[in-house]
UniProtKB/Swiss-Prot annotation:
Sequence-type repeats, residues: 74-81, 82-89, 90-97, 98-105, 106-113, 114-121, 124-131, 132-139, 141-148, 149-156, 157-164, 165-172, 175-182, 183-190, 191-198, 201-208, 209-216, 217-224, 225-232, 233-240, 243-250, 251-258, 260-267, 268-275, 278-285, 287-294, 296-303, 306-313, 314-321, 322-329, 332-339, 340-347, 348-355, 358-365, 366-373, 375-382, 393-400, 407-414
Biased composition annotated in UniProt, kind: Basic and acidic residues: 37-60
Residues covered by region (38 X 8 AA approximate tandem repeats of S-[NS]-N-[ND]-D-S-Y-G): 74-414
Stimuli inducing this protein: Expression is induced by DNA damage, as well as by salt, oxidative, and heat-shock stress.
Single annotated GO MF: GTPase activity
Protein family according to the UniProt entry: Belongs to the DDR48 family.
Region (Disordered) location: 1-430
Modified sites of kind Phosphoserine: S183, S191, S314, S322
Name recorded for this polypeptide: Stress protein DDR48
Gene: DDR48
Organism: Saccharomyces cerevisiae (strain ATCC 204508 / S288c) (Baker's yeast)
Top-level taxon of origin: Eukaryota
Alphabetic keyword roster: Glycoprotein, Phosphoprotein, Repeat, Stress response
Amino acid sequence: MGLFDKVKQFANSNNNNNDSGNNNQGDYVTKAENMIGEDRVNQFKSKIGEDRFDKMESKVRQQFSNTSINDNDSNNNDSYGSNNNDSYGSNNNDSYGSNNNDSYGSNNNDSYGSNNDDSYGSSNKKKSSYGSNNDDSYGSSNNNDSYGSNNNDSYGSNNNDSYGSNNDDSYGSSNKNKSSYGSNNDDSYGSNNDDSYGSSNKKKSSYGSSNNDSYGSNNDDSYGSNNNDSYGSNNDDSYGSSNKKKSSYGSNNDDSYGSSNNNDSYGSNNDDSYGSSNKNKSSYGSSSNDDSYGSSNNDDSYGSSNKKKSSYGSNNDDSYGSNNDDSYGSSNKKKSSYGSSNNDSYGSNNDDSYGSSNKKKSSYGSNNDDSYGSSNNNDSYGSNNDDSYGSSNRNKNSYGSSNYGSSNNDDSYGSSNRGGRNQYGGDDDY
């Protein structure tokens, strides 16, 4: 044991009082006197006088009572990695990687990848981030304005700041006017304005209008132009892809929107739905099986949970953006409008899917027969089921019902199947 160890042992065992009950063995002075020896203490006391000795002893005891050399205190400030301010990696403000404000990767406000407000890929509930489950996030599952979430302002909603919303310069729009998914504004999603998402014509068009350029109209440049392609691409297949094989939006794979693997959904690398990441049949942004757009149950329609009678864009031969020759925004030569019975109507029963105009069965960003962003056959929007846009059955489908005013089979909302009467919009032209 070293000298300093002895000193610390001596100091730490002191109780700084002169307790007669323990024969004065507890305080520093008594310990020191015991170490020196009683004979020497008495010699020193007699040399300087007992009064002076007692005064000196009292002062020494008082001094030692205010002194501590115990270094076992770990609650001090400014230690490396402690929970104090300005420490490296702590959970305080302005630290690197902490969960405080303005830190890199923390879960605080404005951090990169944190779950705070306005962070890239965070998971909090305010001020959206890319891929977080917050408000206004892309592909999140929480509140307002998220892409593919089950909250307000999700994909295709009429709120501000959603994917394809009617705001200025929203995702996929390049014009200067308000554009929204399927709105009747200038430059709406799939409209025939100057800069709408995937359109190339110059006239005003609205969702489901009978103009020359409505959403899925009969002009040459509607949503998913008049190529042999998908939504805004000049390919055979997926949504905005440029390859010639079944691919998704922005990928040259056989898959979903923005994914890079096979048989996937929009932005996922699974066999699933639009924006999901599991390997089972799931929906747009969900992680469950065989589901619809944003739902988590099995074999369902757009947000529903039943297994029959599909909804909007069922998985019949004609779902929303079905696998006709001219789906939603196709390039066929006949007049078509939202809900018409032409070869090109919105969700007709042609060979292709939503936004594709090729001759092979492909969906919105998938290489399947049907669905929007699915990667399997006969699927719905973002599912790999046998369904249409959010539905899961093969018969009796329409927008949330089993026919929706039609009397024929295998049709979707506003489809124009080839074997009978159409739904919602009559037999031929709108």
